[in-house]
């Protein structure tokens, strides 16, 4: 497998790993991270800065779903009891094209062991000035219509002063099994309709009715990141662990976690053979003095 692919211009530097189709880390050219720093040691996708979610995102309770007259099964793909985050993040991707400003990766799931999906996924990561753009496409290569979902799992640095704005209309509580519970109004403590600090407690929730825009500010490094996501990503997953306050995740998703189990295949995108689902999001980095 090739080594990390480095993307670089006069504003940003980014490393990409074919393993997991993951972004390893990302920083400004003067060394300020806007994605989680990787650190030392061998590559581990769970220590990376971003990985793709395909053909579904998050967990599938019960590891199965019904579609038509068929029952389709998933197999757990980690030590957890449920199939989680799809196949792409655990797979080796092929570098199809590469330059200093972009890389195209592809992954073929022709003989699935853990899921019933047969597909081709393509990820295109590019730099343009102070903007990183990530695009993910999945094409159904199976013999029948199947539910597909896509998303990204980016990890951002978290400092004591980190502030977030990401307006949404509602959220899902969390229940046992790290699964969504009930859809309710967003509590004041997690209302990010205006720029505010992350609460000093654990968050692991899906926010729906998202505008596709978010802003992160790191006062300590005088840096800001503006996120824009395609309309297919109408919700985001926010994960901020209580025991490790060095990072948080804000991941665009095309469907609610556990939607296959709760709402059925129609809650995802039903792709006929040959059909494609695609979506992109971007991160634009800028200097920020507003909290100095």
Over which residues does each language-model region extend?
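Short, Gly/Pro- and small/polar-rich lid/capping loops
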Residues: 1-10
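Acidic-aromatic substrate-binding/catalytic surfaces of carbohydrate-active enzymes
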Residues: 15-71, 77
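Short, hydrophobic/aromatic-enriched beta-strand segments in well-ordered soluble domains
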Residues: 16, 105-107, 125, 216, ...
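Short Pro-Gly-centered flexible turn/kink motifs
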Residues: 65-73, 136, 269-287
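Extended, loop-rich substrate-binding clefts of extracytoplasmic carbohydrate-active enzymes
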Residues: 70, 75-129
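Glycine-rich active-site loops that engage anionic ligands at enzyme catalytic sites
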Residues: 218-257
